[in-house]
Amino acid sequence: MAFKLWLLDEETIYEHVFERYTQLEGQSGKLAQDLGIQDRRGGVLEITFEPSGLEGGRKKKRVRRRNKASSVEEDQNVAVDSYHVSVGQSISSLHSSRDNGNSTTGYVLWSTTPFFINWLLYSTSAAPFRLGSQVEVTCGSSCEGHMLELPRLIDLTGADRGKRGILELGAGISGILPVILGNFVDTYVSTDQKGILNKLKDNIMENLSQLTRKRCISRSLRLELPTVEPVGDADITAASLPSKSTLHLEVAALDWEKINLQDKKTHSLHPELSLIGETCSSVYVIAMDVIYNEYLIDPFLKTLKQLKHWLQTTYNLQFHVLVGIHLRSQEVTTLFLEKAIIEYDLTVYDIVDQVIQESRFNFYLIT
């Protein structure tokens, strides 16, 4: 069964937060009681993503290979590819008071991101994000709701003619979202503060082999399509050869406290954002575990408002946001929802799904 959406408002914010943290308390014996670092023991993490619990007891051959994604039987409803990534992280930088202006949480991989990837690719309940479909919306405590049409976040088949993009905010150093989800979109822009970008680029390049469904071009990573040499007397061009579709993948600095898209002079400073507008018909902004203290909330929401207004008015894009939160402080979660809904007038939905509710995470759809 697909997930449902609960439309939150000024009254239901508090009901939602109370219920969600009550669920957490009831599961305290099953869930890890930590801050959410994926693994603080090592500098290099090896992580595998693969299908599990497929419906109907169907057995599918799985192949696990180092730095090589395996593709098996095609299925439109769930992803069937497996991925293995190596993530270089810096525990020392996490605890440094000098690195990146003392903003250091991005130097390690946080567990919200791997959970989101597994849920999005392999959970049957996440199908609306893979297929593009209507989702049931419940409004407040009423049993009567409506249906919301969602565009595909990712296209597993490659047959959809729509051009889709992902803009990642607060990417951190891991680079696993672009090298995995990049297989299923046309444009991917991964952003964070300037001090994070070199390690982010290193991890993307280390795991570029996981982009098995796409040819990747990137100005920021200096990746171009390979040239094709003539064979015999034939003048063969790249366009004449059977090939994969192309992914535009960029890494860019984006400071939430400094961005000002209302000033046309600053547009030239963010060509990667213009790339999304020029190449896509829909965009999802993805932000995983970026809301963990109260000081980040206003800059983050101001950035979302600017991006929404600019991409919709300038390029007429379908615009949606997915925010993943590791549920730590109840006060921070409440404040984020209050500000998003009341102060910034954003439409916020709680993604209601059993798999998510059995975890320490929560995901919100913002339109």
From Swiss-Prot:
Residues 55-74 are annotated as: Disordered. Residues 58-68 have a biased composition (Basic residues). Keywords: Methyltransferase, S-adenosyl-L-methionine, Transferase. Transmembrane segments: none annotated. S-adenosyl-L-methionine binds at W110, G170, A171, G172, D192, W256, M288. GO terms for cellular component: cytosol; protein-containing complex. Its EC number is 2.1.1.-. It is an enzyme of class 2 (transferase). InterPro entries: Methyltransf_16 (IPR019410), SAM-dependent_MTases_sf (IPR029063). GO terms for biological process: methylation. GO terms for molecular function: S-adenosylmethionine-dependent methyltransferase activity. Gene3D superfamilies: Vaccinia Virus protein VP39. Belongs to the class I-like SAM-binding methyltransferase superfamily. RKM5 family. S-adenosyl-L-methionine-dependent protein-lysine N-methyltransferase that monomethylates 60S ribosomal protein L1 (RPL1A and RPL1B) at 'Lys-46'. This is Ribosomal lysine N-methyltransferase 5. It comes from Saccharomyces cerevisiae (strain AWRI796) (Baker's yeast).
